[in-house]
Amino acid sequence: MKFEKALPLLVRRLNHPEPLSRKAREAARERLTYRLDGSSFRDAAGFYRKIAELMTDGTTETGNNLDALNDILRGGFGKHRYGEPIELVWENFQDSRETLGDPLTLRILNIILNADDDHDCLLRILD
């Protein structure tokens, strides 16, 4: 599928998820929630810094790249334990999408939603 079609479909799906089962709602309540304001950074480096500020205690140097994002999502950097289920609420998503561009935004979303990367992250997108 072409990128131009993939991102809008993914965003639409995230904004209009299927109703959660009772069990899924209970599991979501038990997650540590992080809120990312998409209007709080102006470039990719700012995005990575903001993620590190939100999800680490600042005692470990993290990289400004997609691999570091994946590591931070896994946990173990002072805020959530390694492998602990988390939820990321991404506010002002369209601002971030414009700032980061569609190719990087799609790669970030793919990492966040990829359950095979040893992290358990629910994503909610708000505009």
Q: In which residue ranges do the predicted regions lie?
A:
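N-terminal intrinsically disordered, low-complexity segments enriched in P/E/S/T
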Residues: 1-60, 76-127
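A short, aromatic/hydrophobic, helix- or strand-capping loop or linear motif
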Residues: 61-66
